[in-house]
């Protein structure tokens, strides 16, 4: 039997739907001519993003604020169960792992302080097993000295990335304000600190250093929000999913990025469902379990911090009642993601499933083959996309309620996605900015390649 060929796809056409290496693996499965194996590979790709580990080494000299930074990134207080130990003296004697409270596959490692008397740099690097970490946060409470430049050089030698996190800038600002009250300028002081750190890091061999000035006590100020978003942006494709979902939603930008990442999962989950339902392989559809839908929805719920533990923790941090935060949540999944709730939503989504499928078919005619095989793709896509949008909006409302921000709904609304964008485009309403085609086009391209390969396979068998 002749094997089917899945054409190569330009890299820029696959960055939203799936990473390049994922598509290559999928193409290999299709070229083998084993369609059930290809469908199984799709499920594996979806599951991989849920189990990818991320190891982050947090290093620096003693007393730099490493433990406090870890707590801030994990969204926990110093007295919360499982928080990294903090103190005025060195409290970390050996590498200590701190899994994220909600995502245990993401681990921040609190490394012992470097530069201690009697401990050479080489000995320190060996003791903390410097090579095991995916990337680093290099933390310093001062303007980058010999300890920091030595660590920076070693990280660069290993071919890895790091971000220089200058902590306790609030203390520097307060001291400068007291010393020079008449000519004090916060922006000027921060720029002076940044320039000095950049100069020292360039001397260590880093051409374009990433420097973040933060206060661990004020995660909404200075460069802390930028640290969070930059961390996500620079993660390799196979680490990005785990890293993003672990980040606290301290800014609207971080919330939007989290929603964009989960949007990829909506497409993958719907694609798996549609492919399996369309395949004429006995018993294959049964392998696609409703448990996957429940797990996806629970993942959205947890990722946006809408679960009871997250709401209670946020309420304590901002001095409000958890009930006040919960009062602005409107999603029917706010209380529980149960099989009964999912079944009801699934049934409701079936009403609009064919409309969504036909909207995709108008852009990619060959998609009709999949539509003819069943409406599972449209149903799953409609349901998950609607729930994702609702939960993202709930997370936005909770954020506004917690911080009491004076923002209008229009000013802070997250970018619309899913059915609304498809419907607007198919009906000719709105501009290209209102209904971006990039995600739809990428999904359509992959579906076209898959379905074309099936068609060629069928024709060769007929001959």
Curated annotation (Swiss-Prot):
Q: Name the PANTHER family on file.
A: INTERFERON-INDUCIBLE GTPASE, INTERFERON-INDUCIBLE GTPASE 5
Q: Which GO terms of type biological process are on file? A: positive regulation of flagellated sperm motility
**Keyword terms, alphabetized:** Cell projection, Cilium, Flagellum, GTP-binding, Hydrolase, Lipid droplet, Nucleotide-binding, Phosphoprotein
Tell me, in a sentence or two, what this protein's role is.
Required for sperm motility and therefore male fertility, via positive regulation of spermatozoa fibrous sheath formation.
One Pfam entry name: IIGP
The entry sums up its family as follows: Belongs to the TRAFAC class dynamin-like GTPase superfamily. IRG family.
Check the record and name the Gene3D superfamilies matching this protein: P-loop containing nucleotide triphosphate hydrolases
- Per the UniProt record, the source organism is Rattus norvegicus (Rat)
InterPro entries, A to Z: G_IRG_dom (IPR030385), Immunity-related_GTPase-like (IPR007743), IRG (IPR051515), P-loop_NTPase (IPR027417)
Major place of residence: other
Q: Where is this region: Disordered?
A: 409-438
Question: What Enzyme Commission number(s) apply to this enzyme?
Answer: 3.6.5.-
Which positions in this protein are listed as binding GTP?
Answer: 61-68, 86-90, 168-170, 215-217
Q: Which residues carry this modification: Phosphoserine?
A: 246, 303
Q: Which GO terms describe its molecular function?
A: GTP binding; GTPase activity
Name by which UniProt lists this protein: Interferon-inducible GTPase 5
The IRG-type G domain is annotated at: 52-234
One GO cellular component assignment for this chain's record is: lipid droplet
